[in-house]
Amino acid sequence: MDGLTAAESRELDQRLQKRQVKEFMSVFGNLVDNCFTACVDDFTSKALSGRESGCISRCVLKSMSTQTRLGERFGELNAAMTAEMQRR
């Protein structure tokens, strides 16, 4: 990074990595909570029923697809904004 010493750059990288891990854990925790709440309703057995298992699979797939598409869309918007700013 410009203007940073090697030590400052390493510290910044470590902080960014920690932040990314925290954000990932938050997204993962929300995914687990949302899919569990939406899909699991029978607590009479240790194992998931076939319906619950299928529901969780669909929920996770849908959530991951949504996150992927959101990331792509934000990237597209960021690229468009960057291009617009460079034209000025």
UniProtKB/Swiss-Prot annotation:
The keyword ATP-binding does not apply. One of its GO terms (biological process) is protein transport. It is found in: Mitochondrion inner membrane. The keyword Chaperone applies. Its main location: mitochondrion. Heterohexamer; composed of 3 copies of tim9 and 3 copies of tim10, named soluble 70 kDa complex. Associates with the tim22 complex, whose core is composed of tim22 and tim54. Interacts with the transmembrane regions of multi-pass transmembrane proteins in transit. The twin CX3C motif contains 4 conserved Cys residues that form 2 disulfide bonds in the mitochondrial intermembrane space. However, during the transit of tim9 from cytoplasm into mitochondrion, the Cys residues probably coordinate zinc, thereby preventing folding and allowing its transfer across mitochondrial outer membrane. This is Mitochondrial import inner membrane translocase subunit tim9. It comes from Neurospora crassa (strain ATCC 24698 / 74-OR23-1A / CBS 708.71 / DSM 1257 / FGSC 987). The lineage of its organism: Eukaryota, Fungi, Dikarya, Ascomycota, Pezizomycotina.
